[in-house]
């Protein structure tokens, strides 16, 4: 049970190395002219970096650059604007931070000069992650650095900004707030703007904020860098208004390559709804010495399963959007620093975060589309030699999702779990939920939110709520019969209407 058996391969393995695409096309926002090449170096010591930066990189244990670093850092050091496309876990954080820090160093920035570099990123956790890397890289530099994110103390942030923060890492909403309202925030000397995970920033609704931010920030002689895992029309529009004409387009996600890391073993298991929790419980119980992330589709489902597993002495951490920022931050770093453990979370942790040495990614609730799948599994097998495994739970009615994954170049195997290895604790689970008022309420909330999330899936041909066996779904939440709940069902996951569907006892 600790390692599922590999039944059969769904796709071929990748055999090609990532390449750089630097040709000029209108689709790529007038990228560098054909024939222009970046300097190909492999070691950090081959770059003309300052001693404080080289000393920090050595202390961090890095010697050889990843593909995206080798392709991106030289042109950025030369002052070029860059539009970058790279796999998650490719090392792009160092790729943009090193040139930014070198720029501050060469200009001898001091606190009184204000903010010279701004890094914009979609989520608080990713901002904290980048801030942590920046802190290590700037250990031997005199320049100042800081972070502004939603949920943190705004007044304390404003005080630091007024004292002078040379490099600022920020989420879009809080950055716009400070740009508009914090007197004494000096950003007139801005020299570089970095937009990380641009597609995700736009996906979660920050398009208007980004346009306002770019309009406010000075653009004279400003270097800009935009990184995005996918190149959508909206990303191209954002690149057009934020980058100078003729940016260098660097692509290390070629069409012939698999969309996920080479060191990642990926599989799925076909499981009826009423057996899902039993299988998950059995798997986690037998892999307590591993480091595991379990993805669920809603905050309430995370809260329920975390409460349940902790109650029955299977210790887990939880991370979701309804937690206060300090709790999210503490949980994130606790799991990062742990050698083993289980983190149950929503997709808040699925993008960009670099959590060390994750052994397994479990997609207990299925992702909305292949891009979400790729970002989830990107939490393991990170770096050039990273290894990891992933397992996705699918019901028999959801197998159509495999076609979408195959079209997105995701190699997948089917795993089988012997039934005699699955713990049959259903009756004990139902007794517990019936007798414990708090768990009963959180189970009901989790059940309702699961159905709500299912109804909001964008792939309606795969995830059809009218084909869900509600009695079996209810059993996975510890109910012998479905509880009565209200859910909102819309024609699209983006704009559900007010039609109600009731599920009865």
From Swiss-Prot:
Subcellular location: Nucleus, Nucleolus
EC number: 3.6.4.13
Positions where Phosphoserine occurs in the chain: 12
GO CC aspect terms: 90S preribosome; nuclear envelope; nucleolus; preribosome, large subunit precursor; small-subunit processome
Domain of life: Eukaryota
pH note: Optimum pH is 6.5. Active from pH 5 to 8.
Keyword Repeat carried by entry: no
Family matches, as SUPFAM superfamilies: P-loop containing nucleoside triphosphate hydrolases
InterPro entries (alphabetical): DDX18/Has1_DEADc, DEAD/DEAH_box_helicase_dom, Helicase_ATP-bd, Helicase_C-like, P-loop_NTPase, RNA-helicase_DEAD-box_CS, RNA_helicase_DEAD_Q_motif, SPB4-like_CTE
Domain notes: The Q motif is unique to and characteristic of the DEAD box family of RNA helicases and controls ATP binding and hydrolysis.
Name of the protein in its database record: ATP-dependent RNA helicase HAS1
Organism expressing this protein natively: Saccharomyces cerevisiae (strain ATCC 204508 / S288c)
Taxonomic classification: Eukaryota, Fungi, Dikarya, Ascomycota, Saccharomycotina
């Amino acid at each position: 049970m600790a390692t599922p058996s590999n039944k059969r391969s769904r796709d071929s393995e990748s055999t090609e190395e990532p390449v750089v695409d630097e040709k000029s096309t209108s689709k790529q926002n007038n990228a560098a002219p054909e024939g222009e090449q970046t300097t190909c170096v492999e070691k950090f010591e081959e770059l003309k970096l300052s001693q404080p930066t080289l000393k920090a990189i050595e202390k961090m244990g890095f010697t050889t650059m990843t593909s995206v670093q080798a392709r991106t850092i030289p042109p950025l050091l030369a002052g070029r604007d860059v539009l970058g496309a790279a796999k998650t876990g490719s090392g792009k954080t160092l790729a943009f931070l090193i040139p930014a820090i070198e720029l501050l160093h060469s200009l001898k920035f001091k606190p009184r000069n204000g903010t010279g570099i701004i890094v914009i990123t979609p989520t608080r956790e990713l901002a904290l992650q980048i801030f942590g890397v920046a802190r290590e890289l700037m250990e031997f530099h005199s320049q100042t650095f800081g972070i502004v994110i939603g949920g943190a103390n705004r007044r304390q942030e404003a005080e630091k900004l007024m004292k002078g923060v040379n490099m600022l890492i920020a989420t879009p909403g809080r950055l716009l707030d400070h740009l508009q309202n914090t007197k004494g925030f000096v950003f007139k000397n801005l020299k570089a703007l970095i937009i990380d995970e641009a597609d995700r920033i736009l996906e979660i609704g920050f398009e208007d904020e980004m346009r306002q931010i770019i309009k406010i920030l000075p653009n004279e002689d400003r270097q800009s860098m935009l990184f995005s895992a996918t190149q959508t029309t909206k990303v191209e529009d954002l690149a057009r208004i934020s980058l100078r004409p003729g940016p260098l387009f660097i692509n290390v996600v070629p069409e012939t390559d698999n969309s996920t890391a080479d060191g990642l073993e990926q599989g799925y298991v076909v499981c009826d709804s009423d057996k899902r929790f039993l299988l998950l419980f059995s798997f986690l119980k037998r892999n307590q010495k591993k480091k595991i992330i379990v993805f669920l589709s809603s905050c309430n489902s995370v809260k329920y399963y975390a409460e349940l597993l902790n109650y029955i002495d299977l210790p887990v951490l939880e991370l979701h959007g309804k937690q206060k920022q300090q709790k999210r931050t503490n949980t994130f770093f606790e799991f990062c620093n742990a050698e083993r453990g289980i983190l149950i979370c929503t997709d808040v942790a699925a993008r960009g975060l670099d959590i060390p040495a994750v052994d397994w990614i479990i997609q207990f609730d299925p992702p909305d589309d292949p891009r979400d799948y790729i970002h989830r599994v990107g939490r393991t097998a990170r770096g050039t030699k990273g290894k990891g495994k992933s397992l996705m739970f699918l019901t028999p009615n959801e197998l159509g999702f495999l076609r979408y994954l195959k079209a997105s170049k995701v190699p997948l195997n089917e795993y089988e779990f012997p039934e005699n290895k699955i713990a049959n604790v259903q009756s004990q689970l139902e007794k517990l939920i019936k007798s414990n008022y708090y768990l009963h309420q959180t189970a009901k909330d989790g059940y309702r939110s699961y159905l709500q999330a299912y109804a909001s899936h964008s792939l309606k041909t795969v995830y059809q709520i009218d084909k869900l066996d509600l009695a079996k779904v209810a059993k996975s939440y510890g109910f012998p019969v479905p509880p009565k709940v209200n859910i909102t069902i819309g024609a699209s996951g983006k704009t559900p209407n007010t039609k109600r569907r009731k599920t009865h006892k």
